[in-house]
C-alpha cells in the first residue's frame, strides 16, 4: 500500500476561505411546456419564431431558527410567429416553456450585508447551468430547435429588483 496523503498547505490552499453557503439540494419545482396551437403550428410555421425570455429570482427562509433558504430561479420562454409585415403584430404563440428550478441552501454565518447577494446572485449563478439545460431539452423534446439561454447578469437583475422595491427619492442620485 502506498502513502497518498493530501496536504492542503502543500497545494497552496491554506488561505482559501470556506464558502459561506452549502447547497443542500436542487430540484425542478415546476415545469410546463405547451404548444397552444397544437400540431397545426408545425404545418404553418414558415420561419424561426421570435422568442422572449423573462427571468425572476426569489428567496425564502424555510426555517426561522436556522439559516436555511429556498432560492427559486423562474424562467418563462415564449415563442411567437414573426409578424406578417415589418412592424406588425406578432402572430400566434408557437410554444410556452415555464420552469421554476430551486435550490435549498444553508448559509454558514456570512456577514449580514452579504446574505441578500448570496441568495439572489451567487446561488442563481450556481444553478443557472441546470436551468439552461432543462429549457434547452424541453424545447427540443417539444419538437422545436432548442432554446439556449444566454448568460445572465444576476448582479444587474438583483440591482434592478432592488431599485423597484426601494426607489430613490426624486432629486437624489
UniProtKB/Swiss-Prot annotation:
Localisation: Cytoplasm
Main location: cytoplasm
Cross-referenced InterPro entries: SecB, SecB-like_sf
MF annotations from Gene Ontology: unfolded protein binding
CC per GO annotation: cytoplasm
Pfam families named in the record: SecB
SUPFAM superfamilies cross-referenced by the UniProt entry: SecB-like
Plastid in keyword set: no
GO biological process: protein folding; protein tetramerization; protein transport
Keywords: Chaperone, Cytoplasm, Protein transport, Translocation, Transport
Tree of life domain: Bacteria
Claim: Isomerase is one of the keywords in the record: no
Purpose of the protein: One of the proteins required for the normal export of preproteins out of the cell cytoplasm. It is a molecular chaperone that binds to a subset of precursor proteins, maintaining them in a translocation-competent state. It also specifically binds to its receptor SecA.
Family label: Belongs to the SecB family.
Subunit structure: Homotetramer, a dimer of dimers. One homotetramer interacts with 1 SecA dimer.
The protein's name: Protein-export protein SecB 1
Amino acid at each position: 500500500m502506498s502513502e497518498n496523503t493530501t496536504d492542503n498547505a502543500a497545494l497552496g490552499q491554506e488561505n482559501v476561505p470556506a464558502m459561506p453557503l452549502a447547497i443542500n439540494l436542487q430540484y425542478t419545482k415546476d415545469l410546463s411546456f405547451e404548444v397552444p396551437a397544437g400540431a397545426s403550428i408545425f404545418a404553418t410555421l414558415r420561419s424561426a419564431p421570435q422568442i422572449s425570455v423573462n427571468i425572476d429570482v426569489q428567496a425564502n427562509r424555510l426555517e426561522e431558527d436556522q439559516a436555511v433558504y429556498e432560492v427559486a430561479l423562474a424562467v418563462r420562454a415564449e415563442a411567437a410567429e414573426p409578424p406578417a409585415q415589418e412592424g406588425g403584430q406578432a402572430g400566434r404563440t408557437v410554444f410556452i416553456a415555464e420552469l421554476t428550478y430551486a435550490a435549498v441552501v444553508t448559509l454558514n454565518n456570512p456577514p449580514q450585508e452579504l446574505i441578500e447577494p448570496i441568495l439572489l446572485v451567487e446561488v442563481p449563478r450556481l444553478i443557472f447551468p441546470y436551468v439552461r439545460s432543462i429549457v434547452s431539452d424541453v424545447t427540443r423534446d417539444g419538437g422545436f430547435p432548442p432554446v439556449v439561454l444566454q448568460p445572465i447578469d444576476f448582479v444587474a437583475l438583483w440591482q434592478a429588483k432592488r431599485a423597484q422595491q426601494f426607489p430613490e427619492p426624486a432629486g437624489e442620485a
